[in-house]
């Protein structure tokens, strides 16, 4: 018998995650949990005596939920974890804050260095987890430290150096939930910041399928080259499996054309990975996470 910890937040059983993802595919979470606050989350983790499997969920922008759903508990940090505040010349930002919202906040307050976030879908916590970056900047350039909690309910802090940022990854422990991110502040000019953000938005709209059901870049760039160039060279621009295809506009983006399953998308990515390796001798590494059970 499944015994859930007593919490102040919200549980939902057999919860459909599809509508929370950008691809709009996937199965259900056995248990979906939105904690009220950090102490509520800590209480849940300490009480998790059955050691229910735990997955964390952000904005659903770079993830494929497999069609068989997710066993155990999916934890999503809601609006209570999205605050932005000034403390001692630093920004303290809740991990569920959207990258776009932080970029707009910084522009309004003449804080430079965050312009690139306007072009990165997802949350601040997810951005730290994968060292997200675009247009010449990455999270490693602006993060001072993070506050987090492990699955045993211990609050922890990690400095930029301790995080160990790498290209699209880091050295943080796996069983960790990021709660807050502390950023350094560099003052700038609001008008210049806005101009740069507009440049980024214009570049995205002209080169990426941002109006489609997509999950961002499918594969990380190998050292010294671009994934899209290798995919294009292998003749896979527009290639389709079921309801999923590689974008004609930017062939490192997968698209759900309306009737794709999670299996279609994952099969397409695996096929592209195989064909690029055969064509160029380079094995592309997934940037999009795939989690859950196969049906």
From Swiss-Prot:
Required co-factors: FAD
Pathway note: Cell wall biogenesis; peptidoglycan biosynthesis
Molecular-function GO terms, alphabetical: FAD binding; UDP-N-acetylmuramate dehydrogenase activity
InterPro entries: FAD-bd_PCMH (IPR016166), FAD-bd_PCMH-like_sf (IPR036318), FAD-bd_PCMH_sub1 (IPR016167), FAD-bd_PCMH_sub2 (IPR016169), MurB (IPR003170), MurB_C (IPR011601), MurB_C_sf (IPR036635), Oxid_FAD_bind_N (IPR006094)
UniProt KW keywords: Cell cycle, Cell division, Cell shape, Cell wall biogenesis/degradation, Cytoplasm, FAD, Flavoprotein, NADP, Oxidoreductase, Peptidoglycan synthesis
UniProt-listed Enzyme Commission number(s): 1.3.1.98
GO cellular component, one term: cytosol
Subcellular localization, as worded in the UniProt entry: Cytoplasm
Catalytic residues (positions): 168, 217 (proton donor), 287
Pfam family, one: FAD_binding_4
Keyword Cell division included in the entry's annotation: yes
Catalytic activity reported: UDP-N-acetyl-alpha-D-muramate + NADP(+) = UDP-N-acetyl-3-O-(1-carboxyvinyl)-alpha-D-glucosamine + NADPH + H(+)
Annotated ranges, domain FAD-binding PCMH-type: 24-188
Principal EC category: oxidoreductase
GO biological process, one term: regulation of cell shape
Described purpose of this protein according to its UniProt entry: Cell wall formation.
PANTHER family from the UniProt entry: UDP-N-ACETYLENOLPYRUVOYLGLUCOSAMINE REDUCTASE (PTHR21071:SF4)
Similarity remark: Belongs to the MurB family.
HAMAP family: MurB
Listed name of the protein: UDP-N-acetylenolpyruvoylglucosamine reductase
Gene, per the UniProt record: murB
């Amino acid at each position: 018998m499944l015994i859930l910890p007593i919490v102040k937040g919200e549980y939902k059983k057999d919860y459909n995650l599809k509508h929370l993802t950008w691809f709009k595919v996937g199965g259900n979470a056995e248990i979906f949990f939105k904690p009220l606050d950090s102490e509520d989350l800590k209480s849940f983790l300490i009480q998790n005596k059955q050691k229910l499997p735990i997955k964390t969920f952000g904005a659903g922008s770079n993830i494929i939920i497999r069609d068989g759903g997710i066993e155990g508990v999916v934890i999503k940090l809601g609006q209570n974890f999205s605050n932005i505040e000034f403390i001692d010349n630093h920004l303290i930002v809740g991990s569920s804050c959207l990258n776009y919202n932080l970029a707009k906040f910084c522009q309004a307050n003449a804080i430079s260095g965050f312009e690139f976030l306007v072009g990165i879908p997802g949350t601040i916590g997810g951005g730290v987890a994968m060292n997200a970056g675009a247009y010449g900047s990455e999270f490693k350039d602006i993060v001072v430290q993070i506050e987090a909690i492990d699955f045993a309910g211990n609050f922890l802090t990690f400095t930029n150096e301790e995080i160990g940022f790498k290209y699209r990854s880091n050295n943080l422990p796996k069983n960790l939930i990021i709660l807050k991110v502390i950023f350094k502040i560099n003052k700038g000019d609001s008008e210049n910041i806005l101009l740069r953000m507009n440049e980024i938005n214009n570049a995205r709209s002209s080169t990426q399928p941002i109006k489609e059901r997509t999950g961002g870049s499918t594969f990380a760039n190998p050292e010294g080259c671009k994934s899209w160039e290798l995919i294009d060279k292998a003749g896979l621009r527009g290639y389709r499996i079921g309801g999923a295809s590689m974008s004609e506009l930017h062939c490192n983006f997968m698209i759900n054309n309306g009737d794709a399953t999670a299996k279609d998308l994952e099969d397409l990515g695996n096929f592209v990975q195989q064909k690029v390796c055969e064509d160029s001798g380079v094995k592309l590494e997934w940037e999009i996470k795939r989690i859950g059970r196969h049906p």
